[in-house]
Design a protein with these regions (language model features):
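A short alpha-helical cap/connector motif
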Residues: 1-111, 115-122
Length: 122
């Protein structure tokens, strides 16, 4: 499939901030996430960098979706003013996840685009 025809790509183009995404994933995202579009879901992205992906996912999933971002950088909290929930923490720490899930509850989709070292991914 041509990634430019995907709903993910269309949402990517609408992002309010810089969004770094590899287009070769867009077909996969559409295949996996299409069933969640325009539904009341909780979506969590680990690693939000400049925040653009939050807007991309908001465009993709629709207004019913609860979009949550996790990052190490405290400056990421600035995106809360746009209706996103932002948590600052280290994805490699069990203590972070324990607190996170206690507060958040059930999550429908988790996308890990955070740390790229072995200890952060295992």
């Amino acid at each position: 499939m041509n990634y430019k025809k995907t709903n993910t790509y269309k949402s990517f183009l609408k992002s309010k901030y810089y969004c770094l995404k590899h287009t070769n994933y867009f077909d996969i995202y559409d295949d996996l996430f299409e069933k969640y579009r325009n539904k009341k879901i909780t979506f969590v992205e680990i690693g939000i960098f400049s925040g653009g992906s939050l807007f991309m996912w908001r465009n993709y999933f629709g207004k019913k979706a609860r979009i949550i971002g996790i990052d190490l950088n405290p400056e990421s909290k600035k995106f809360e003013k746009y209706g996103f929930e932002i948590f600052i923490g280290d994805q490699s720490k069990k203590s972070f996840w324990k607190k996170f899930f206690k507060k958040i509850g059930k999550v429908d989709v988790v996308l890990d685009d955070g740390g790229h070292t072995n200890y952060q991914q295992v």
